[in-house]
């Protein structure tokens, strides 16, 4: 990854693992400067801490220095808690001292929404680039090395003894050191680091995630992001996380923003910005969740669970109602609770002796807290169809001990606990937390978490062998065609030119002829074979059907002549005259295929995106589509096809033959390579409909429209 350097890693390492800390703006008052100093001083036995403030000789019992340059050593990190107007001066002093890392708590930059604030932040960013002093912030709450109890943070909350393997990165400092930290403490979820990135004038969310990929103490990365400073960089980080098998779990806000924009094609109208992010995160293995609790619970589950050996879920509970509700929630989200095999069923029935019954989910009634409970868990765990064990109970001390022992006995099997008792601290619940048993408090959240665990490892197993597709080289013929059409920037190309373009990338198109008079139209129809379709080949009018510019099912010469005259008239009424009308296209009718849409759009943040969905004129009504970033491989293409509800028609429906799904997948791959190779110059592309013919007969593009941009 070209954006990642040794200096960058070293600077972040100094922020998170400092041996010396300077707090500029340190104060005896417990405002930001005072809290930051107090937090740092908790590690003063291991870390040299230097208050810097010319107004004091001593702060909080520690000698205070007038400036960074007056310090007895070069600090690993300088914490800046001064007015926004003073920040650049402090950064310059720090650079003169040789410091390579700064955490800027100060606010008053771009978050103010003023030009003055934006300009000041731009100056901070420029200083970081030119000096090599890397900056977290401004307008952040700092960072914390939780596992080593070193807090470079202006938060009033600490968390002694909370060290663990979940690395937390948040753009919002108030969220990082507020609800996330509070919930982690309450739930006993151990963290390795807490990082707030603030306005990201220099280092951004992706930089810190990238650092955590190299950190052996961090098994899972949890994040809260409002928007990516560089979305493509995050995608590269996500790819690297997949290669290393380190999960990223993310809250990405903005689900309610539909990203509506003026667009000429169906594809752009169907592709909201959040839908793009959702597709991209899924494509690269990032687990997207909705809220604080879900983020931490899923992160805790993945950090304390091996990959399930099977997809089946075994549920054991002391309550028939709870076990049934849990099974219902699991079933709704697509999890499987297999029937017990003979050995498990007979073994459990032997233990229960008529009090309850052997099933999955298993209601063990009065035996839930007995000495027999470990045997029941073990019988279920030994069933090879079971990959994950769930215990649902209000649990006492003895049962918590038994569950912990079961986890230690079968370390290769994920185990989760659905706690049904009071969430007030009890000995049993406390034991489970301290033993790092993943605990959930509602059946739906448990089901969602286990779904994420299974899906992630399934996805990882596939990507671990196939990797990610690369953009292939564009050939000379393709480049020439694209270069010629790029001069039409912003204009919706005619169908004839759009089809000619996609044909260069191996997309099959209908047989057709562009004519200028009725006699030639009749001759072309005779050569193609009746029935035929006829269309006015116009520019800048992508939805031809709405303007009466498409005639279908023409069966003879008389119908062709009549259609020619009508299309010319309708084109004139639509304003398509002169250079706006290339002619009338006579085309073969494809009548035995399934209509689908294949499209491309380009997003300035994420790049080229391919869309697949149910096709035809009603595509925007049904919005039955799947998205991926380009390029894709064939397995991605097959996943996209499976994601679309209307794709059932491709499998054969009510006596219709199965369609050529293999050829469709190949076409999706070709179009994705085209979009990736053109890298933004192709703004939009619709192939709608693409006709998927019966198995073995391929596909044909019956219509297409492309839009280029400079």
Q: Which ranges hold each PLM region?
A:
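Catalytic-core regions of core metabolic enzymes
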Residues: 1-710
């Amino acid at each position: 990854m070209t954006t990642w350097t040794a200096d960058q890693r070293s600077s972040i390492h100094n922020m998170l693992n400092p041996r010396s800390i300077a707090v500029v703006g340190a104060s005896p008052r417990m405002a930001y400067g005072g809290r930051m100093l107090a937090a740092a001083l908790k590690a003063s036995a291991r870390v040299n801490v230097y208050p810097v403030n010319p107004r004091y000789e001593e702060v909080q019992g520690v000698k205070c220095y007038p400036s960074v340059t007056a310090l007895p050593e070069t600090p690993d990190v300088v914490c800046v808690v001064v007015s926004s107007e003073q920040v650049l001066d402090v950064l310059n002093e720090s650079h003169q001292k040789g410091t390579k890392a700064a955490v800027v708590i100060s606010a008053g930059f771009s978050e103010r929404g003023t030009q003055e604030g934006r300009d000041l932040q731009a100056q901070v960013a420029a200083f970081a680039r030119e000096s090599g002093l890397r900056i977290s912030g401004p307008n952040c709450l700092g960072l914390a090395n939780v596992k080593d109890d070193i807090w470079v943070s202006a938060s009033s909350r600490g968390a002694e003894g909370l060290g663990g393997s979940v690395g937390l990165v948040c753009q919002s400092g108030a969220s990082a050191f507020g609800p996330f930290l509070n919930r982690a403490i309450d739930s006993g979820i151990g963290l390795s680091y807490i990082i707030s990135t603030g306005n990201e004038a220099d280092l951004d969310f992706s930089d810190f995630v990238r650092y955590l990929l190299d950190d052996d103490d961090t098994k899972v990365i949890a994040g809260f992001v409002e928007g990516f400073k560089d979305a493509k960089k995050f995608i590269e980080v996500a790819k690297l996380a997949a290669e290393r098998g380190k999960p990223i779990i993310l809250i990405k806000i903005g689900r309610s923003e539909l990203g509506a924009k003026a667009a000429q094609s169906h594809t752009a109208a169907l592709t909201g910005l959040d839908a793009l992010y959702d597709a991209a995160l899924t494509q690269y293995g990032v687990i997207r969740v909705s809220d604080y609790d879900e983020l931490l619970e899923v992160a805790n589950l993945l950090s304390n669970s091996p990959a399930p050996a099977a997809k089946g879920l075994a549920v054991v509970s002391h309550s028939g109602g709870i076990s049934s509700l849990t099974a219902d929630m699991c079933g709704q989200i697509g999890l499987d609770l297999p029937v017990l095999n003979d050995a498990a069923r007979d073994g459990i029935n032997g233990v229960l002796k008529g009090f309850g019954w052997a099933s999955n989910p298993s209601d063990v009634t009065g035996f839930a807290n007995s000495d027999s409970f470990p045997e029941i868990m073990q019988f279920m765990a030994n069933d090879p169809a079971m990959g994950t064990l769930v215990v649902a109970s209000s649990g006492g001390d003895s049962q918590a001990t038994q569950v912990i022992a079961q986890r230690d006995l079968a370390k290769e099997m994920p185990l989760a606990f659905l706690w049904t008792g009071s969430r007030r601290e009890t000995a049993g619940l406390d034991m489970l937390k301290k033993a790092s048993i993943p605990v959930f408090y509602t059946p739906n959240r448990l089901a969602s978490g286990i779904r994420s665990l299974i899906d992630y490892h399934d996805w990882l197993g596939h990507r671990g062998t196939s990797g990610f597709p690369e953009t292939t080289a564009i050939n000379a013929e393709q480049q020439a065609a694209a270069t010629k059409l790029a001069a039409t920037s912003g204009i919706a190309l005619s169908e004839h030119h759009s089809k000619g373009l996609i044909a260069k990338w191996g997309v099959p198109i209908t047989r057709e002829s562009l004519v200028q008079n009725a006699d030639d139209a009749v001759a072309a129809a005779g050569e193609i074979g009746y029935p035929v379709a006829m269309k006015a080949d116009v520019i800048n009018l992508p939805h031809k059907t709405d303007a009466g510019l498409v005639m279908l099912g023409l069966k003879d010469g008389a119908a062709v002549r009549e259609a020619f005259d009508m299309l010319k008239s309708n084109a004139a009424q639509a304003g398509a005259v002169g250079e706006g009308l290339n002619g009338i296209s006579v085309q073969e009718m494809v009548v035995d295929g399934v209509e689908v849409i294949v499209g491309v759009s380009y997003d300035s943040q994420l790049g080229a995106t391919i869309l697949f969905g149910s096709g035809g004129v009603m595509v925007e009504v049904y919005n039955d589509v799947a998205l991926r970033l380009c390029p894709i491989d064939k397995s991605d293409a097959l996943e996209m096809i499976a994601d679309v509800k209307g794709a059932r028609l491709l499998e054969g429906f009510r006596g219709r033959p199965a369609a050529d799904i293999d050829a469709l997948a190949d076409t999706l791959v070709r179009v994705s390579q085209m979009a990736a190779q053109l890298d933004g110059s192709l703004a939009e592309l619709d192939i709608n409909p693409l006709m998927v013919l019966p198995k073995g007969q391929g596909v044909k593009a019956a219509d297409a429209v492309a839009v280029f941009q400079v």
